C-alpha cells in the first residue's frame, strides 16, 4: 500500500504528516517532483526527481502506481488517472476523490479553465493552507490507513 505524492506543490505540513505516518507505520512513501525535495532519513521514504516538463511527475506517478496505492495530489487530471488505475486519492486539504466524485471535479475544472481563459472569471487561487486543512488531511490519511489495515 505505497503512497505516491505529487510533491511539487504539496504543502510542507502535509509532507510532515506523511513523513511521520510512513516512518511510524512502515508505509512506503515516494515524493515525485521535478525539483529536489529533501526527505528525512528512513528506509520507508524516498524522493524522486524527474525531469522538468509538463506533467512529467504526474505521468511517472501514474505509470508507477498499482491498484490499492494512495496518491496525494491537488491535480484533478492526475487524480482522475490514478482513480482509473484503482488508486485512492486524497488532496492536501483532506478531500478524498472517488470514481463517483472525480467526473464532476474534472468537469468543474475544465469549465473554470474555459471561463478564466475567456477572461470571464478572475481567480486568485486557493485560500492559504490552514490548521483546519492540516487536520482534515491527517484525518483522511488515518481513515485510508485504517481501511488498509482491515484488508
From Swiss-Prot:
This is UPF0178 protein CJA_1978. It comes from the Bacteria. Coiled coil: none annotated. Belongs to the UPF0178 family. It comes from Cellvibrio japonicus (strain Ueda107).
